[in-house]
């Protein structure tokens, strides 16, 4: 029996690693061929760790991944418009992002980097759409597809 569990656990680890590899590969590839848009931001790597390695965690649920990223990026863009690039704008943006994720029950820790990226990079509202919303949606769809393929009897919680 131990051998059977050992094999199953290792297969799940391989599927998780392969899933993360493929997902970040495609996002990186799109980033390399699209000269007008940025597709890849560092928080996506952290999101993939949660989504692929601990997909049952409340923090890795599709709703949290998608809306956590959008709310956090929006917070950063808003504070940049209001206060520019300053220590207070970065601090307020991150605090506001945490507040929004808590009240909407969409906490996703990797998204906490988005307000900092938005302010330091002087990002506009377009940053929320591309790469944040587009990338987060890609990660969610990719992860749900992989979970459905590897565990066909598991319902897709969205």
What are these regions (language model features)?
Residues 147-158:
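Single conserved hydrophobic/aromatic residue that forms the stacking wall/gate
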Residues 48-58, 101-105:
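C-terminal ends of transmembrane helices
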Residues 1-8:
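Short, Lys/Arg-rich, polar N-terminal cytosolic tail immediately upstream
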């Amino acid at each position: 029996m131990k051998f059977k569990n050992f094999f199953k656990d290792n297969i799940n680890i391989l599927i998780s690693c392969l899933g993360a590899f493929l997902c970040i590969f495609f996002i990186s590839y799109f980033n390399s061929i699209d000269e007008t848009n940025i597709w890849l931001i560092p928080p996506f790597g952290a999101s993939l760790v949660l989504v692929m390695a601990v997909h049952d965690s409340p923090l890795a649920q599709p709703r949290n991944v998608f809306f956590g990223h959008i709310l956090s990026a929006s917070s950063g863009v808003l504070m940049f418009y209001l206060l520019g690039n300053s220590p207070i704008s970065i601090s307020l943006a991150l605090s506001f992002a945490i507040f929004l994720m808590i009240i909407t029950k969409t906490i996703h820790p990797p998204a906490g980097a988005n307000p900092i990226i938005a302010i330091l990079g002087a990002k506009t509202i377009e940053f929320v759409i591309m790469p944040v919303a587009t990338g987060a949606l890609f990660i969610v769809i990719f992860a749900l597809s992989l979970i459905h393929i590897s565990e066909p009897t598991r319902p897709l919680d969205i």
